[in-house]
C-alpha cells in the first residue's frame, strides 16, 4: 500500500497534472479493476446480483475483462500499472467509520492517482475518493436521498470531455445517507441535486465520481424501497411517492461506458 499522505507534494502535483505521471497509453489489453466495497442484503443480491456484478454490467464489461477485488473482505489489488482503469462500487459501509480495509483502499487510490490511472467511483466509491485526497465525508445534513431524483449539470461540466452532449438535467438513482461534505483541494464539482451539492466531481483529468448510482436500474430501486420502506417512513420520507417516481435513468446509466470509452478503451 502507498505510504504517503493526502497532503504530500506528490499528491498535489498529481491532482493538478495527472498526465505528468501517466499518459492515456495504459494498455488496452489490461483488465479493468473493480474495487468491491460491499453488497446489498442477501435478498436483493439474489435478485439483482452484488454491487460488483451490477457495476460490471453497467460498464458493458464481461467477467474476463475485469479483476474484481473484494477489499471489504481483506483482498488487495495489484499495482495500478496492472489495470487500464479502476471502478469503485457502492457499499452499506460508511466512509466516516474509517475501517482498516477502507483506509488501505484509500492509500491505494492515492498511489493510483499518482500513476495516472483513470478511476470512477460510485456512492461509497465517490466518498472514498474524496476522503483519500483530503476531502471530508459525513452524514448529509439535508437527510437521506433515495429513489429517482434529478441531477443538474453545473457550468464546470460544459468543457468536460466525459460530459459532452449530456443534457443539463437528467434523472438518476439515489441511495445514500452520507455525502462529500468538503471537496478535496483542486476537485471540480460537475453536478448537483436538490439534496446534495456534490453529486458528481472530477479530480485531476481522469478521475470521476458520482454520488448517484449509474449501475442501478429502476427494478432494484423499487425492490429496495419495498424492503426498507418502514425504516424510511420512520425518517419521514414519502415512500409511496418515492416508489411512484422510480423510472429508467438512461443518461446516468450510460456514464460508466462513456468513461471507459473516453479514458480507458479496451482492445
Each model region followed by its residue ranges:
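Short, glycine/charged-enriched secondary-structure capping and boundary segments
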Residues: 47-50, 81-83, 100-103, 134-137, ...
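Structured helix-beta-strand junction loops
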Residues: 62, 108, 115-116, 169, ...
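Short glycine-/acidic-enriched loop or helix-start segments at secondary-structure transitions
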Residues: 44-45, 78, 97-98, 130-132, ...
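C-terminal and late-domain segments of enzyme folds
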Residues: 188-190, 196-202, 206-267
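N-terminal beta1-alpha1 cap of cysteine-dependent amidohydrolase-like domains
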Residues: 3-4, 10-11, 15-107, 111-115, ...
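Pocket-forming structural segment of enzyme catalytic cores
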Residues: 133-219
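Hydrophobic/aromatic beta-strand patches that form the interior of the parallel beta-sheet core
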Residues: 33-35, 67-69, 87, 120, ...
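Cysteine-nucleophile active-site neighborhood
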Residues: 89-160
